[in-house]
Every structure is written in C-alpha cells, then in structure tokens.
Amino acid sequence: MAANKERTFIAIKPDGVQRGLMGDIIKRFEQKGFRLVAMKFLQASQDLLRQHYIDLKDRPFYPGLVEYMNSGPVLAMVWEGLNVVKTGRVMLGETNPADSKPGTIRGDLCIQVGRNIIHGSDSVDSANKEIALWFKDEELVEYKSCAYEWVYEN
C-alpha cells in the first residue's frame, strides 16, 4: 500500500455522539486532508466491543469500558492518507484529556479519561485488525478525491 494509502480506524464513542461532536470531528479529519473511505453508525454489540478491546481484558477498567461503549451509538470510520495513523493520534490528543494540548480533539472537547469521546488506532497493525473487525472489505470505498492533487505533491 502506498504511503498515502495508509488507513486508520477512528470511532466516535457514545459520549461524543450524544454531545453532537460528530460533525466537528469529521471536519477536522477532512480539513487535514484525509479521505473518508468507510463510515457506519451503529449500536456496537458487547461481543464486538470485547473483541475490539481484547488487549485490555485483564485491566480492572475493562468491564466498565465495554459497558460504556455499549451505552449508546458509535460512529465507526476508516480514514486514509499519508501517515494517517500517527497523525490521527496526534490530532486526538492524549488518552487522558487533562494531558492533551489545546488544538487536539480531546484537548478542546473533553475533560475526563473515562469520557474521552474518541478512539483511534495506535499502530498500522492495530488499524488493520480494527478495520477488519468493524468493516467488511466491500464497505471500504475506493475513489479519488478531487482535492488529492492539492493535498499531495505526487
């Protein structure tokens, strides 16, 4: 996959949905120059959430995390672009909003770690696993944005 074809999984959590922050978050990724290739709005099942957070299953907060993520709808997305995993994480800010810089999503829009409004893949490998877990291949849309030439040099 070409460098500008890297993909990441981003999910707006139930608190972000309930607070009406979906449009602002999508706008930030679009304005950065990333391309949305898949999106679905769903009530994630506990089974899906347990699989998604399997690496955290032995942590004391795991049951509460699954319950919180299951408490309302989630907006699951796949974004594509140059270094989108790393840059996406920078855009999100630190997991704990109190440690996030102004200008980041968490730094601007939330206060507590337990309500940090958004998830983003932490590595290319994690992104690939998360995308495969949440989306079927045929749900990933291939298209060339007319803005492509204005975002990338070549």
Curated annotation (Swiss-Prot):
Cofactor dependency: Mg(2+)
GO annotation, cellular component aspect: cytoplasm
UniProt-listed GO biological process terms: CTP biosynthetic process; GTP biosynthetic process; regulation of apoptotic process; UTP biosynthetic process
Major localisation: cytoplasm
UniProt: ATP binding residues: K13, F61, R89, T95, R106, N116
HAMAP family linked to this entry: NDP_kinase
Record-given protein name: Nucleoside diphosphate kinase A2
Annotated source species: Xenopus laevis
